[in-house]
């Protein structure tokens, strides 16, 4: 889009592990960041904002929420009507968090990794996405290793197995590191060409599930 962080407001919906990392990096890059996380706000009173306020101020609105009765279609026509003209919505949480039909009518831009009706995303939603990927945001080497380690830890607790701290030996845990906006823009394309990934999915939408099943894991970039 040619945007610079200092000129833009990033809205984050869901400030758990991933959302917190997004917040930390975005603030470091110079974005103005506004956050919404009602469960955390109720528990911690940490100054998070209501969803509609965040949506109204955001140039980019990104979702990092679980899917339950309270989040299904939380991004729908009412919310879209409060967003800025030309704003961009990003969803890498669960497809049903966003009402796809309403998004098509919204006039917004969107970048989606998750979709309603997977593995058969709406053709118009797919074709008109700024970026489209086949639900692979967590498909890094470390992401898969973390999920495996969590499963092992859960089984170990359930059955009393001596596996505290176990982690797949083939994968080194990712350690977040500072990275400037300039370095990110200059180098990330060499680590992961998301534009090429998006083109492949748009050209061959019927391969959605196959692309996931045969995805080559990448190391986390930062």
Predicted regions and their residues:
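Phosphate-binding beta-alpha-beta segment of Rossmann-like dinucleotide-binding domains, i.e.
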Residues: 1-9, 24
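Residues that mark the start of a beta-strand
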Residues: 8-11, 32
